[in-house]
């Protein structure tokens, strides 16, 4: 069963008022004159979309509580008895959020009889309110029974264990500790560790209490949890005296590393320097090296290099890390001799160290940027061969493989086959299969080429190389060739067989999860409804179905895109026919279609290319603002926008103009047209220039005599730009198949 059909199967059981045709029939195309965002289909949720409906009234009350707004919710419930239980649930949750524990418990009791599918929510909030009211421990524990037996598993179960532990802490702290340890994986953090530490302290197991308070302090640099843990540690230190277990050097080092990762450089340096009081050893020397390297993160490589050269670690791994730091400093200072000297020393004395791998890659990347193949190819080869299990070993191997292919060297085919066999699950395997196909075509082995392209067209249909493969399969000599058995065997031996449709028959858990989320949303508790679906996506094994439900409720197209990307990271692996059209429209939205098509037509551009670029730049968020201060749908810098606004006759330009979809589309398409003209009509070069700048593209084009655009794209040294070009072209292809005539 496909996702398209499985979603239809869910509907009758979940939502009797929604007809199946809404889900699986013909969806309306994007608005022909669509100058505004897409709106959610009215049959998606039972909650009235009017601000005067229950969901709207509850939302307003929770956002800004007042007696008048509470009265509005109560009045709605009185006038609509069929929704009174939902209103009671909402009022109970709102009262809990406001700290009105008696009212929360009272409202939740009223809601309980008619909300069995979400009894765990009622149980958790009621128990939590009664705990705050200091009710009898037995009564609090009894309230939690529906959470313990919830099917499917509940997103509030972790918080419920904390409520139970707090209820038990005073009278039976040891039982509270056992409870939390038994369900540790479910506990929300850092509250879980804080509560466990509290219970250990109540049980007079002070050393264990210190361990978990220290864990909270180490993992949380700021916030209430960190402050509570710090205060508790001070109290326990005073109480325990010499028996207080001091944090281990590795714990202190990890906290210092977190401070560095957070770019809190002064605090990080202080934390590293504080390890000078520990016994000589690896952690102490690592702290010295990392403190010395901090100026490197502040763009002062010379100062960092001077500090690192002054150190003389005795521990091999600390010395290896110091040498890597020196290589980094030399690269920043463009001192290739010193960089390679550090790499050479690492090879002589620390051949198996991860710091040598890092130095090899640092140096290789440095030379790759300048197209110095005689330097970077041996470095990548060493990284791939000497560190074959490294997380990015496939990338290092691919750099060598593609170089050999691009320059038509004799071992290119063997390296491409090796890429597939060694790293079949890596994304570069698709690149290798494509270029094996191109090699086969060059040798007029169209039978092998057909096999390679057919695999890409099936397994990578919505990816860049799948798109290219479909074009190759359209050639008569490839299409008519008999498939090569040896090529099939090569792919099969690497595990690259034809993809099987995903198991998407909706489970009972998925169906119930959607029903629960709709009840919560109908009560105006959209945050809980969203959390229910996200939890189910992680726990139930059918993230696509649940992500679709959540994306349908997104208030704007860009939010739906983000939901689906996050919850279904492999969404592009689905075939078009395995999901309803609406799923793809949410993933590849086309709001402002009329404006976009008009702007594209004005500048003689493919509207689907423009749409593909916008999806990659801003996901169709008209208010998008990048860290580089690029604005709007097409992410235009104000200085560039001002220049092209004049060309478009847009007067009184300001940065705010770029947040207007109509103006941004006119300016953005004008920029694209100008860049396309400057690049002799090459879409690939234009996209690379749009992302990385025109000067770089001119340099990259001089690196080789590219036989096809894909070779240029694969040669782009910046991963971000290379991925960007491929993604925009892939997006455009999907838009064309989805919305084209």
Name each model feature, range by range.
Residues 64, 99, 134-135, 171-172, ...:
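Residue-level detector of the short coil/turn that links helix A to helix B
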Residues 349, 354, 358-361, 370-375, ...:
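Catalytic glycan-binding domains that act on GlcNAc-containing polysaccharides
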């Amino acid at each position: 069963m496909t996702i398209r059909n499985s979603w239809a199967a869910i509907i009758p059981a979940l939502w009797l008022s929604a007809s199946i045709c809404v889900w699986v029939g013909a969806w309306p195309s994007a608005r022909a004159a669509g100058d505004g965002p897409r709106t959610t289909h009215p049959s998606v949720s039972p909650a009235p979309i009017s601000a005067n409906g229950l969901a709207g009234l509850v939302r307003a009350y929770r956002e800004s509580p007042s007696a008048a707004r509470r009265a509005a919710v109560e009045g709605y419930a009185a006038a609509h008895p069929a929704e009174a239980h939902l209103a009671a649930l909402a009022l109970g949750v709102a009262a809990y959020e406001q700290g009105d524990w008696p009212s929360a418990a009272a409202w939740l009791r009223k809601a309980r009889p008619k909300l069995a599918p979400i009894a765990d929510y009622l149980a958790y909030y009621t128990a939590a309110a009664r705990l705050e009211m200091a009710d009898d421990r037995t009564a609090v524990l009894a309230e939690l029974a529906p959470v313990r037996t919830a099917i499917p598993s509940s997103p509030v179960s972790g918080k419920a264990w904390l409520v139970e532990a707090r209820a038990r802490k005073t009278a039976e702290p040891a039982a509270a500790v056992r409870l939390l340890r038994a369900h540790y994986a479910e506990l929300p953090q850092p509250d879980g560790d804080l509560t466990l530490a509290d219970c250990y302290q109540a049980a007079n197991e002070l050393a264990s209490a210190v361990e978990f308070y220290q864990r909270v302090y180490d993992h949380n640099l700021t916030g209430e949890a960190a402050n509570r843990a710090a205060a508790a540690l001070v109290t326990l230190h005073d109480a325990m005296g010499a028996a207080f277990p001091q944090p281990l050097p590795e714990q202190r080092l990890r906290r210092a590393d977190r401070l560095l990762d957070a770019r809190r450089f002064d605090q990080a340096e202080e934390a590293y320097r504080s390890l000078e009081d520990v016994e000589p050893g690896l952690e102490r020397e690592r702290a010295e090296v990392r403190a010395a390297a901090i100026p490197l993160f502040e763009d002062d490589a010379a100062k960092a290099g001077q500090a690192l050269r002054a150190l003389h670690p005795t521990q091999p791994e600390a010395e290896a890390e110091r040498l890597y730091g020196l290589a980094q400093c030399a690269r920043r200072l463009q001192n290739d001799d010193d960089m390679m000297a550090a790499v050479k020393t690492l090879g002589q004395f620390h051949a198996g160290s991860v710091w040598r791998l890092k130095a090899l890659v640092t140096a290789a990347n440095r030379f790759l940027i300048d197209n110095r193949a005689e330097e970077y190819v041996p470095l990548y080869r060493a990284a791939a061969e000497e560190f074959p299990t490294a997380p990015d070993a496939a990338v290092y191997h691919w750099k060598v493989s593609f170089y050999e292919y691009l320059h038509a060297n004799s071992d290119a085919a063997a390296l491409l086959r090796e890429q597939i066999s060694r790293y079949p699950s890596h994304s570069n395997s698709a690149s290798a299969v494509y270029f094996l196909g191109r090699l086969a075509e060059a040798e007029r082995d169209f039978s092998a080429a057909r096999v390679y392209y057919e695999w890409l067209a099936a397994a990578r249909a919505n990816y860049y190389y799948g798109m290219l493969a479909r074009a190759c399969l359209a050639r008569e000599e490839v299409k008519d060739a008999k498939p090569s058995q040896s090529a099939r065997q090569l792919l099969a031996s690497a595990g690259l067989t034809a993809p099987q449709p995903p198991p998407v028959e909706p489970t009972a858990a998925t169906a119930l999860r959607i029903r629960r989320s709709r009840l919560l949303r109908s009560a105006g508790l959209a945050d809980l409804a969203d959390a229910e679906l996200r939890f189910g996506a992680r726990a139930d094994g059918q993230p696509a179905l649940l992500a679709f439900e959540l994306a349908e409720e997104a208030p704007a197209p860009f939010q739906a895109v983000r939901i689906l990307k996050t919850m279904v990271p492999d969404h592009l692996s689905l075939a078009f026919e395995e999901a309803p059209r609406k799923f793809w429209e949410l993933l590849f939205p086309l709001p402002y279609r009329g404006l976009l098509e008009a702007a594209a037509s004005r500048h003689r551009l493919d509207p689907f290319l423009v749409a593909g670029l916008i999806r990659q730049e801003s996901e169709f968020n008209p208010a998008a603002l990048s860290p580089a201060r690029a604005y709007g749908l097409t992410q235009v810098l104000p200085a560039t926008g001002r220049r092209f606004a004049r060309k478009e006759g847009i007067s009184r330009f300001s940065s705010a103009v770029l947040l207007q979809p109509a103006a941004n589309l006119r300016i953005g398409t004008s920029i694209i047209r100008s860049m396309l003209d400057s690049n002799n009509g090459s879409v690939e070069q234009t996209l690379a220039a749009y992302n990385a700048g025109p000067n770089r593209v001119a340099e990259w084009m001089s690196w080789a005599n590219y036989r096809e655009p894909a070779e240029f794209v694969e040669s782009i040294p910046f991963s971000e730009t290379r991925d960007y070009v491929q993604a925009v072209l892939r997006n455009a292809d999907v838009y064309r198949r989805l919305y084209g005539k």
